[in-house]
Design a protein with these regions (language model features):
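Cross-family detector of peptidyl-prolyl cis-trans isomerase
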Residues: 1-118
Length: 118
């Protein structure tokens, strides 16, 4: 699959296209995800969170600002059953403040997101 780069700097790649309902703005979605800090060479580094490890899917209203902008943008257009890799620059991630002592300031993040339901 090809890596797509959006105007915001988000990069995404569909690892496995879904075949179910499409995630669009305003819909409640349920996902499994794993997040890593990106190493300087672009590879996935330290894993900082995973709903899969907890077996606890995460739900949110897409496009409503409940999550970082990179997620609101990157999950749109996915279809249920699909898996997408998101590379999220700090500008649409946690920015200069970082998050919770786990994500340092200005960190680029890598997420693997599986859309479970819409």
């Amino acid at each position: 699959m090809a890596i797509v780069t959006t105007d915001s700097g988000l990069q995404y790649e569909d690892i496995k296209p879904g075949t179910g309902a499409e995630a669009t703005a305003g819909k409640q979605v349920s996902v499994h995800y794993t997040g890593w800090l990106q190493n300087k060479d672009g590879s996935a580094g330290t894993k900082f969170d995973s709903s899969k490890d907890r077996n606890d899917p995460f739900g949110f209203s897409l496009g409503g600002g409940q999550v970082i902008r990179g997620w609101d943008e990157g999950v749109q257009g996915m279809k249920v059953g699909g898996v997408r890799k998101l590379i999220i620059p700090a500008s649409i991630g946690y920015g200069a403040r970082g998050a919770g002592g786990v994500i340092p300031p200005n960190a680029t993040l890598i997420f693997e997101v599986e859309l479970l339901g819409v």
